[in-house]
Amino acid sequence: MAEIGGKNMRKILSLLLALLLSACPAIAEEEEEWTLEDMLADLDAELVADIFINAEEAQSILEAQAEKSIYEADGSVLITITGTGDFTVGGDTRKSSNIWDTELKKHKGDYQFAMKNIRDILLADDLTIVNFEGTLTESTYVPSSKKNNQFLFSAPPEYVSMLTENGVEAVSLENNHVMDHGEDAYIETQTHLSNAGVVWSGGGEIGVIEVKGIQIAMLSYLCIDRYDQLWDTVPANIQAAKELYPIVIVNFHWGNELMYYPTDNQIKMGRLAVDSGADLVLGHHSHRIQPIEQYKGVYICYSLGNFCFAGNSKPSDMTSYLFQTRFRVRGEGEEQQITNEGFIIIPIRISSRADKNDFIPTVLTKESTIDSILNTLKENGRKHCEYAVDEYPLAWPATK
């Protein structure tokens, strides 16, 4: 079989495309059915033979090129992962109107508005993980344990596309709002996520997502008032996951609200997770940013603050950040080696406006505001975290 060189292959594919495009007006004017053979009828017989005889080989070449594209120049696989803070959209079914609906009307019912300023960042990475703090349900049922809660969060099931359309591939379902409408609504939320292809972990379930051929495991835990139950459970679960998957990420919902530094239990649990085999720890709940530690080479983000947060029309602090890290994978099987390539943070405000929360997370550009975020992280790291990172890079080094 004759070989098709790169230029010849491009020529053939370009020719096919040109033929298809040129046929469009004729197809529109005449309602008769056109076939590929019709379009190739006037071509040189040898060229036509090349096209059909080498179709299988061409497909193999294209598949090989697609597979090759996941590899770096040195043959390794580089995986970029983004972690965000609390994702809370929709409203409270007990109320006739809510702050989310008010903003939604301004955008003519297009609920994708909230992600418009951050979408490109999340689409550009390989995996984005958010803390999904709420439910995907139309249920109005409120458990007796929740009747006195100030906030109950739910969003219509179709809002799952806010994740899939904007580069969010995985969510944690361990927090104090996933049960706002009871067990049935919690299971319904899991179902909507799974049907949409969004990986989730929670309720004792591990989430597994494959990225560039590498399987990544995700575990999630609600620690508030549960530490005594978790000191033995968490390390056992992480160790079991690490035996099966090369990269293990652990989400914790923990700590105190409105605090800029971790509690002793957060620190103890975060380091225990690393000692047990976790490759990355992401924390939530405080609605405020907290420092990052690098413990035994593993990053522990104690709190990523808020992200897309419709729980407050004007939080006293609307600054936050996206955490982004990279893993490099070399080799396969027993020879496989995984190294962390560092991290950056992307400072954001959870609103596109400074005077109120419009639920549109937006990358910050004002230097003084960015400096304030960096100073908050560094100062609280020095005071409260033995292994706090010294610097918070804002951009990846330029590719050589």
What are these regions (language model features)?
Residues 29-400:
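Acidic, metal/ion-coordinating pockets
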Residues 1-8:
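Short, Lys/Arg-enriched N-terminal segments with co-localized hydrophobic residues
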Residues 8-9, 384:
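Polar low-complexity intrinsically disordered regions enriched in Ser/Thr and small residues
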Residues 9-29:
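Sec-dependent N-terminal signal peptides of Gram-positive bacterial secreted proteins and lipoproteins
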